[in-house]
Amino acid sequence: MDFSIKPLDAKSTIGSIKTGCIAVAVFEDKKLSAGAQALDRKGEISAALKSGDISGKAGSTLLLRGVNGGTTERVLLVGLGKQDAVTEKDFNAAAQAVVRAFTTLGSSEAVIALPFDTVASRDSAWAIRCTILSAREAAYRFDSLKSKKEPTASGVKKIAFAVPAAAVNSAREAVTQAVAVANGIDLTKDLGNFPANVCTPTYLANTAKKMAKEFKLEVEVLDRKQLQALKMGSFLSVTNGSVEPPKFIVLKHNGGKAKDAPTVLVGKGITFDSGGISLKPGAAMDEMKYDMGGAASVLGTMRAIAELKLKLNVIVVIPTCENMPSGSATKPGDIVTSMSGQTIEVLNTDAEGRLVLCDALTYVERFKPAAVVDVATLTGACIVALGHHNSGLFTRNDDAHDALANELLTAGKVAGDTAWRMPIEESYQEQLKSNFADMANIGGPAAGSVTAACFLERYTKKYTWAHLDIAGTAWKSGAAKGSTGRPVPLLTTFLIARAQAAGK
């Protein structure tokens, strides 16, 4: 799908555009947008709104032909809600409705001439990004493993956004950013949707290598012997039951100044999680291929920022392996020594994500990072707490960590990929006490997402850190089963904002 900008000025107006379809907005209070007014020379649009053929409610649509004297073949009316109270939700509903209508349209090209600056506190660039991401979401298909591919949908393949000439530069930048983010989302979805016999730790490592070659990134992949030399006993304990070799991926984008400390993203990469000896129930176990959602999302984020040539130093670190039962697998009650030297009593082998992450969080100390954000499908408890709407955000409570949390929360709101801050307090650490080791890897059924974050927090004392639990947001179950691509929009928006702040 191709996206472009169509500048509007005194000579090039909405009324003079020749294309297969123009989408313009109408409002619930029976008012026309400026774009609709420009096409309503003979009153057809006003009549349709007045008669009730379209309500103007956000997301309502009506396709008309022969409007504006035929300079354009079709006019798609789309409702935006009440004119003076258009919300982000309203605009997104309208954008998604336009995209749905375009997929079945008998034209390959169209122009969107909505009032992109109609949402309070959001600019035209935000609206354009939302529309492009909606279009790419609708266009996404995962059929690479099917012997018979789904037929490619007809409809619009080229979309132009009609904007005033003064807004062209920011609009073009919005298109560039949105396409890069969409490419990152698609990569994340593909990696998540591949089965575990395809997307192995080696496959993830090869994906990182290909990305490094394409975008001139630095890459290093550590194997078992190197991990043993680093004394990553916690990470390696998870790998004991599988024949798949573990990998530890380090991918660097050196877009900032050499002296600038990097922002580090750590992604949990369990390519299949059976639970190990603490075996999961069989129902829906196939969905445990998504337990590498953190790894997939940080790779997708890296792809997006590399495509944008973001002026920021970013490092992605991925500890990746399978968690399988076998005669050599780690057993409940085993005690392992992490890279930090702290010992862990493994009371439940299905709480393995924190065991691989803690060694990665120790490893990244060497980069002297500006901030570290780990991303993981870590706990079912987070789904109980937050459902499938918000990712869980955890960090310490001080000025530096509050600032990092606010950066991530703001990025999530801007991107429509929201997170909710959860508590980390010393009182929860009591639940991780062990009679036989420095800590246990679980803290009982109460506040499971919090105690998991508290476990990770013990390995992050030397830098500013945040944890995103994406167990409820990384994929969908049921008829719409598949990877969502989250939290790539949040992470890319966060990094873009950091790059902009660094450039000031």
Curated annotation (Swiss-Prot):
Binding positions (Mn(2+) 1): D273, D350, E352
Any GO MF annotation of the entry: metalloaminopeptidase activity
Protein name: Probable cytosol aminopeptidase
Main location class: cytoplasm
A Pfam cross-reference name: Peptidase_M17
Single GO biological process annotation from the record: proteolysis
UniProt KW keywords: Aminopeptidase, Cytoplasm, Hydrolase, Manganese, Metal-binding, Protease
Residues of the active site: K280, R354
Presence of the UniProt keyword Cytoplasm in the record: yes
Subcellular location, record wording: Cytoplasm
CDD domains: Peptidase_M17
GO cellular component terms, A-Z: cytoplasm
Cofactor(s), by name: Mn(2+)
NCBIfam families per UniProt: PRK00913.1-2, PRK00913.1-4, PRK00913.2-4, PRK00913.3-5
Cofactor note: Binds 2 manganese ions per subunit.
Chain positions recorded as Mn(2+) 2 binding sites: K268, D273, D291, E352
Catalytic reaction list: Release of an N-terminal amino acid, Xaa-|-Yaa-, in which Xaa is preferably Leu, but may be other amino acids including Pro although not Arg or Lys, and Yaa may be Pro. Amino acid amides and methyl esters are also readily hydrolyzed, but rates on arylamides are exceedingly low; Release of an N-terminal amino acid, preferentially leucine, but not glutamic or aspartic acids
Enzyme class: hydrolase
EC number in record: 3.4.11.1, 3.4.11.10
Function: Presumably involved in the processing and regular turnover of intracellular proteins. Catalyzes the removal of unsubstituted N-terminal amino acids from various peptides.
Record-stated family: Belongs to the peptidase M17 family.
Annotated source species: Janthinobacterium sp. (strain Marseille) (Minibacterium massiliensis)
